[in-house]
């Protein structure tokens, strides 16, 4: 499917908890179905199917929560939160046709590895983890799924995950409710009360060479990334995805790292930088010039400009975007020459030779393929 919008019909709509609903999507054209890796997401353009609901279409991203072994259908599971998700919950019904891109995303289970896996999720962050559990079920690879949420009412997929774990000694699940009731603990709806702690992880995880995957809100990510680092897990063994402003999680582990502004990105990410072009590199006042090659425009950057996305829009251009926070990758654009710095570290680095406009500023004169 790649970057093309394709039509997918809502075949089923099922509540998973008080706040999360699943949408089962089937392609209008069966040739549009593509296999996906556990952890990937779909991009949806919402509003096109219901012109009365939104003043303009919204672009949103939802992790695939179903089994990657299933063919001809996708499942996304959406928390009722924010305009796009509320639109899905309230307006989209079985039979409606949605515009979809994907699957895509680099936050995926390493299925070539044989190391034991720790899956840590908070709230709706469990959606990619459920897909990973489906992928791990037939493999015999050891996996510990530890999920934290507020209470039984908002806990999605409990029965589905329990069914995967049952009869498979290599799979383990542990649920932590912040507001656990005595009956939740008694009937096995959850196993611990409060928050995930270092002591809890030490009690659940035998000493081993783990790979960890984290997904959840920023506070959850920061706390649990720090716990894993404290327990000795190398940062290279921790993959993460969350839905919020991009954050350097290593800071939560009190690890000294160079600030984003000190990490320039070159046009080709090469060890040897190309010589700077001499003519017309700066405008009056010493400000760098930003060139838009495709549009045949060039303008001087000013100290008041926040990022290259805002700058391009102010120049009358319409680059693709969605999150404006370094998370989604929609604004990735080819950097033809020059260097940029990131004011906020992207959640996932763009492809080689590309730059995320929404969180980048020019270090000097730059040329963009826009």
Where are these regions (language model features)?
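Ferredoxin-reductase
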Residues: 1-97, 149-151, 162, 178-180
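FNR/FR-type flavoprotein reductase catalytic core
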Residues: 83-291
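Local cysteine-cluster metal-coordination motifs and their immediate loop/turn environment
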Residues: 128, 313-339, 351-364
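Short proline/glycine-enriched turn/loop segments at secondary-structure junctions
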Residues: 229, 345-349, 357-359
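C-terminal accessory/binding modules appended to enzymatic or scaffolding proteins
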Residues: 281-324
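Short hydrophobic/aromatic patches at helix-to-coil boundaries
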Residues: 367-370
């Amino acid at each position: 499917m790649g970057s093309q919008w394709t039509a997918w019909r809502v075949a089923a709509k099922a509540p998973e908890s008080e706040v999360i609903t699943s949408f089962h999507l089937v392609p209008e054209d069966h040739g549009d179905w593509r296999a996906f890796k556990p952890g990937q997401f779909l991009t949806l353009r919402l509003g096109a199917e219901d012109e009365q609901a939104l003043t303009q279409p919204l672009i949103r991203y939802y992790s695939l929560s179903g089994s990657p072994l299933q063919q001809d259908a996708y499942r996304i599971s959406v928390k009722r939160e924010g305009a796009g998700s509320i639109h899905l919950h309230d307006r989209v019904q079985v039979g409606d046709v949605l515009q979809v891109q994907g699957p895509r995303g680099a936050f995926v289970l390493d299925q070539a590895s044989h190391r034991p896996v720790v899956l840590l999720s908070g709230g709706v962050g469990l959606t990619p983890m459920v897909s990973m559990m489906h992928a791990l079920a037939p493999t015999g690879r050891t996996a510990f799924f530890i999920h934290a949420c507020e209470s039984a009412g908002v806990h999605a997929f409990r029965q589905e995950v329990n069914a995967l774990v049952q009869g498979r000694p290599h799979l383990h699940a542990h649920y932590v409710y912040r507001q656990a009731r005595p009956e939740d603990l008694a009937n096995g709806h959850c196993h611990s009360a409060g928050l995930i702690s270092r002591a809890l992880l030490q009690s659940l995880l035998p000493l081993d060479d783990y790979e960890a995957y984290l997904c959840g809100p920023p506070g959850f990510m920061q706390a649990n990334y720090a716990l894993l680092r404290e327990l000795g897990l190398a940062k290279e063994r921790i993959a993460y995805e969350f839905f919020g402003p991009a954050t350097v999680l290593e800071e939560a582990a009190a690890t000294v790292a160079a600030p984003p502004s000190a990490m320039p990105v070159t046009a080709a990410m090469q060890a040897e930088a190309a010589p700077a072009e001499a003519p017309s590199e700066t405008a009056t006042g010493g400000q760098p010039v930003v060139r838009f090659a495709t549009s045949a425009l060039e303008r001087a950057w000013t100290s008041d400009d926040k990022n290259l996305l805002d700058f391009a829009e102010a120049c009358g251009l319409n680059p693709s975007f969605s999150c404006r926070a370094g998370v989604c990758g929609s604004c990735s654009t080819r950097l033809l020459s020059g260097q940029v710095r990131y004011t906020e570290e992207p959640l996932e680095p763009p492809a080689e030779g590309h730059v995320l406009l929404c969180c980048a500023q020019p270090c000097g004169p730059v040329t963009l393929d826009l």
